[in-house]
Amino acid sequence: MESDAKNYQIMDSWEEEPRDKSTNISSALNIIEFILSTDPQEDLSENDTINTRTQQLSATICQPEIKPTETSEKVSGSTDKNRQSGSSHECTTEAKDRNIDQETVQGGSGRRSSSDSRAETVVSGGISGSITDSKNGTQNTENIDLNEIRKMDKDSIERKMRQSADVPSEISGSDVIFTTEQSRNSDHGRSLEPISTPDTRSMSVVTAATPDDEEEILMKNSRMKKSSSTHQEDDKRIKKGGGGKGKDWFKKSRDTDNQTSTSDHKPTSKGQKKISKTTTTNTDTKGQTETQTESSETQSPSWNPIIDNNTDRTEQTSTTPPTTTPRSTRTKESIRTNSESKPKTQKTIGKERKDTEESNRFTERAITLLQNLGVIQSTSKLDLYQDKRVVCVANVLNNVDTASKIDFLAGLVIGVSMDNDTKLIQIQNEMLNLKADLKRMDESHRRLIENQREQLSLITSLISNLKIMTERGGKKDQNESNERVSMIKTKLKEEKIKKTRFDPLMEAQGIDKNIPDLYRHAGNTLENDVQVKSEILSSYNESNATRLIPRKVSSTMRSLVAVINNSNLPQSTKQSYINELKHCKSDEEVSELMDMFNEDVNNC
């Protein structure tokens, strides 16, 4: 704990001191002496904890596999060996005379959240500086993020002078050391520090970055942001159909971008290539020298300082070569305003990102729905159609902006509604035409029926005339009479003489015609017979059936059947009597049957 407190005091004193080259070197030497005075075992344990912490922090970020690196050992009197690493992760050096392993990790995976972050901080795309100790020949490397620098420096006047990753560092009395082609393909500052051979010409003299360098970096980022925003707005206007104005504005923006790009590519070859951040030479008592250079990538990503630390890796879509622009004279207050405006722009970018994701989901669902319904075969064939509705659908599916999608959808709905109205009018006109045709058909059918009736009547009249002509033909011998003769002669029915049969009512009426000889007693006459004058159903003795003895069955059959039918007996008994009457063969059987009939009538 005491060592940590001393370490914090030394670091705080080093940050609060005025920034000169001499003060930087002296304060750095003090820190190195303090670190070397501590126990190496504690440093190793601390390094282990730091390594474990960095692994925990970087667990969610997808990193390429770290290839095993080799360690170089240097013995006194041995020749210098040049080694350049082709991968993004480089090896560390190991001093044979001292059993102290110093591991410096650089990259996005090595983010430290411990209390020793003031002494050693490693951030991707940050500012790196090296501190050397000429006595013991050890070296500590410090990589600090720009965002953390702004948090630590509360006062702009007392801001810390650090070296920028995008500005070349010049070493007095020596040439600039450039990186190799392999280091250009590195993963943007997330690799381990490479090892290079000691350069006798390079000295441990480092030029610190000035506020102008920081302003220059901010200007570069803001300019890149503006150019990207202008391209996005231009795309939106073109998709919405802005017309000639959008095209003129797009040409102007392209001209301005070309001018800025030409001005950016003017610097010398020193600015075009990425130089090594720090080169230090250390000599120990035995005469062994060790140099450790931190080579950064040649292509720096067009990183946006507004993006958070969690999403900066996935959203770096374009890379631009590092360029050096003429130093501007912006004030430090403008830098503060830029830093204050970060959260607002960050929120707007987050909303735009959500809108784009939702629009992409919408387009995917719409495309799948249209393909399933069979409206379209593929999205590539939408551009081949010339129909207004299909063009609107293609604009909706291909456009990213939700506002323009809504506009095209509104146009599509209006076009569909107008088409439906026209189709409805056509259908109504067709229905009216069909009704008119039906009326015409009904009228023609009615006329046809009338004609058929007229023809039928004409045919019947012709047939009748033909019949008259045939009947009258061939009868020339007939004498003509003055009497009127009908044109149509009909066959007359012959009059048949009807034979009146005997009816018992004839006796009551006094009709003497057709009186049958059916008297029971031969001596009785009609005048003296009382039974004949009485009613038929008055009594048994007065019944006509009792005294009727038919001479012939056929002559009396109907009269007896009529008597039975006029009785009050039920129909079944009547029918049975009639059937029995037909089977009678003699007058005795008839008389017995009629006696039974009279008994039944009296009992009723």
UniProtKB/Swiss-Prot annotation:
The keyword Phosphoprotein applies. Residues 22-42 are annotated as: N0 binding. Gene3D superfamilies: DNA helicase RuvA subunit, C-terminal domain. The keyword Coiled coil applies. Keywords: Coiled coil, Phosphoprotein, Viral RNA replication. Essential cofactor of the RNA polymerase L that plays a central role in the transcription and replication by forming the polymerase complex with RNA polymerase L and recruiting L to the genomic N-RNA template for RNA synthesis. Also plays a central role in the encapsidation of nascent RNA chains by forming the encapsidation complex with the nucleocapsid protein N (N-P complex). Acts as a chaperone for newly synthesized free N protein, so-called N0, allowing encapsidation of nascent RNA chains during replication. Residues 450-483 are annotated as: L protein binding. Belongs to the respirovirus P protein family. This is Phosphoprotein. Residues 91-101, 147-163, 245-267, 330-360 have a biased composition (Basic and acidic residues). InterPro entries: Paramyxo_PProtein_C (IPR002693), RNA_pol_Pprot-P_XD_paramyxovir (IPR016075).
